Regions:
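Membrane-proximal, glycine/serine-rich, low-complexity loop/turn segments characteristic
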Residues: 1-97, 117-152, 189, 194-200
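Outer-membrane beta-barrel translocator domains and adjoining extracellular loop/strand segments
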Residues: 32-48, 94-109, 156-166, 170-172
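Extracellular loop and loop/strand-boundary signature of outer-membrane beta-barrel proteins
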Residues: 52-57, 111-118, 174-181
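Generic signature of intrinsically disordered, low-complexity, basic-rich segments
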Residues: 75, 109-111
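Outer-membrane beta-barrel transmembrane domain signature of Gram-negative proteins
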Residues: 172-200
Length: 200
């Protein structure tokens, strides 16, 4: 599959104000095909008891959208104020379809299991940063302040289905179905202040 990774940056300064922004987009698809064969052997006679074969087709499709917008205000030669907004949105899908066949030693089909797994995910986040930097003098004395707010939201839907059949393609037992929903909500608040005072 083709992959795409693009970004755009912009910076503009006039007088005491500096604006900057970045936009990014990423698209990717991956695949994996597996063909697994096993023989089960009787330890005492070394004869083949049964044969196992698994065919799996795995597909993963994901995208990423990123954006950042910020501004610096140079209040004076010693003091700078800033604000930054950033966010991302990453949707994606994953699928795994497997056929599992069990054969006798003569390679006659005994049973078959069809397994299907799908995952639909959406992950997004947003952050805000307020910052201040003040230089007291030329000796290196400096004060910096940062206040941040970050939020993350995730929705993850999962489906797992296993169906069981005999050698004639007739269901042997009821299919297993497992449905999952895994949401996440995260909020983070931080603040810090640093003061630098050189000793010499």
């Amino acid at each position: 599959y083709a992959k795409l990774n693009e970004s755009f940056s912009f910076n503009y300064r006039k007088n005491k104000v500096n604006f900057f922004s970045t936009l990014g987009f990423n698209s990717r698809k991956n695949f994996q095909d597996l063909n697994i064969q096993r023989k089960f052997i009787e330890s005492s006679t070394k004869e083949v008891k049964s044969n196992f074969e698994q065919l799996s087709r795995i597909r993963d499709d994901g995208k990423s959208h990123n954006a950042k917008l910020g501004m610096d205000y140079f209040a004076s030669k010693k003091t700078t104020l800033g604000v930054v907004f950033s966010g991302f949105y990453n949707p994606g899908k994953f699928g795994n379809h497997s056929d599992v066949m069990i054969y006798d030693p003569a390679m006659s089909l005994l049973s078959q299991t069809l397994a299907s797994t799908s995952n639909d995910r959406k992950w997004k986040g947003f952050s805000t940063n307020l910052n201040l930097r003040h230089v007291f003098d030329s000796t290196g004395r400096e004060l910096t302040v940062d206040v941040d707010y970050l939020t993350y939201r995730s929705k993850n839907s999962q489906d797992l289905i296993n169906a069981y059949y005999d050698a004639h393609g007739l269901p042997t037992i009821k299919a297993d179905t497992l449905l999952g929903s895994l949401p996440q909500d995260i909020n983070i608040y931080t603040a810090k202040m640093d003061y630098t005072h050189p000793l010499n």
